[in-house]
Amino acid sequence: MEEDLFQLRQLPVVKFRRTGESARSEDDTASGEHEVQIEGVRAGLEAVELDDGAAVPKEFANPTDDTFMVEDAVEAIGFGKFQWKLSVLTGLAWMADAMEMMILSILAPQLHCEWRLPSWQVALLTSVVFVGMMSSSTLWGNISDQYGRKTGLKISVLWTLYYGILSAFAPVYSWILVLRGLVGFGIGGVPQSVTLYAEFLPMKARAKCILLIEVFWAIGTVFEVVLAVFVMPSLGWRWLLILSAVPLLLFAVLCFWLPESARYDVLSGNQEKAIATLKRIATENGAPMPLGKLIISRQEDRGKMRDLFTPHFRWTTLLLWFIWFSNAFSYYGLVLLTTELFQAGDVCSISSRKKAVEAKCSLACEYLSEEDYMDLLWTTLSEFPGVLVTLWIIDRLGRKKTMALCFVVFSFCSLLLFICVGRNMLTLLLFIARAFISGGFQAAYVYTPEVYPTATRALGLGTCSGMARVGALITPFIAQVMLESSVYLTLAVYSGCCLLAALASCFLPIETKGRGLQESSHREWGQEMVGRGAHGTGVARSNSGSQE
């Protein structure tokens, strides 16, 4: 075996990293081609391609000038105790976000009856939350890119906690309208927890971990319904609002442990802070730090909207905006439709719908019954199989095909509701539809942080989240107002929107499956080191992979 070993001994030095990218010495950048002479090995070697994230053999290392990037360190340290703690902490933020969203479908019918609100005011109460989220999502993304992921997330959570508790003491409709809007403004920053979380995850674990963090969303929605079952009959909606803020309070107490992203620190020039964070992770995980010197990435302007519309990202950004719009439009529409359809009973009976319209026009109302809560709980439990299905297919089909499949299944279930079905079949169809639309949402949360570079990752996720809130803003007027006029038209709108979103998913120019996170907006996607042998020479080139 000893005679098979060989060494690289040709300058300029080619350093192989786990990211699959190449770094060349500045003396020979003009030629674009770098030869590596291999001593003692015959000519005619076949091309060898190093996969992204592949470990580099020690015999290829440069013993005199070892360097590494944050991506290398994260891959070397791996997944361990630190990431488990981070999962729980960011999961609390997600759980709180889910509870604040789920409470809308419970609070709306309650206030409709208690305060004798017309349908448009009930819809407005839901929409104002999404107005706040829409107006703040880009702002929180910009703050996270400019001042750090931890800073943006902490401020948004504390903001939501403060106004969430205040809204429980609202004396009249106008007060709760304003306060819930301010709650929505704070919730707009909670998705930045995904940005922070993703930047600490090794490549092989990233998709699975981001999907598993979505389990906390499912737990939040289920917990909110269970909480409502016990709290609403005895204590009322004000106590429900107060108790729903408990996960936010826990996050506020525990967030002192939360570190800043090492990727952000390097990009902003804080090399020492980044190294300290990486050493902390290595210590907690019981893994060694990479040897050598941490490379400081070229400092770039961060959080600039124009960077989302460079030729490389323009179509990705526009298509993602529509995908996120459709996800939220359909997901929250289904959440609101669930309570409306269960209260209506036979959704296929036109005469019953007319009676319901007449009743609602006279401001008659129905409180959610115990049966309504149980059916709501069953459909909410669909979040869990949604996570499991997405977890199983996302690394097999890829991110794009997973999103497309979820949209298609949701559309199919929506169309089946055109058939006259009983309550049990209605519950089953809503269960399947919600499982897959939540799965599509989860896949989008995996794809978006992966496709944007560190300099614009938070802003990219923030703008996508903002477009999602536009969809959520519109959906109450479809699910609660249009439903009174036509059940079929309402279902057709949701089904058609998701079919278009499925097409948009297929046309995304970049597939991020198996890719490392991009550090710089000046690097092309899919750069790989390829060793080519011809006539006794190995040639290493940096090739830009095509956009799939």
From Swiss-Prot:
It is found in: Cytoplasmic vesicle, Secretory vesicle, Synaptic vesicle membrane. GO terms for cellular component: synaptic vesicle membrane. Its main location: membrane. It is a multi-pass membrane protein. Detected in brain and adrenal medulla. It comes from the Eukaryota. Keywords: Cytoplasmic vesicle, Membrane, Phosphoprotein, Synapse, Transmembrane, Transmembrane helix, Transport. It holds the Pfam family Sugar_tr. The chain crosses the membrane at residues 88-108, 123-143, 157-177, 181-201, 210-230, 239-259, 317-337, 374-394, 402-422, 426-446, 458-478, 490-510. One of its GO terms (molecular function) is transmembrane transporter activity. The keyword Nuclease does not apply. Residues 109-122, 178-180, 231-238, 338-373, 423-425, 479-489 are vesicular. Residues 528-548 are annotated as: Disordered. The modification Phosphoserine is found at S25, S31, S542. Residues 1-87, 144-156, 202-209, 260-316, 395-401, 447-457, 511-548 are cytoplasmic. PANTHER family: MAJOR FACILITATOR-TYPE TRANSPORTER HXNZ-RELATED, SYNAPTIC VESICLE GLYCOPROTEIN 2. Belongs to the major facilitator superfamily. This is Synaptic vesicle 2-related protein. It comes from Bos taurus.
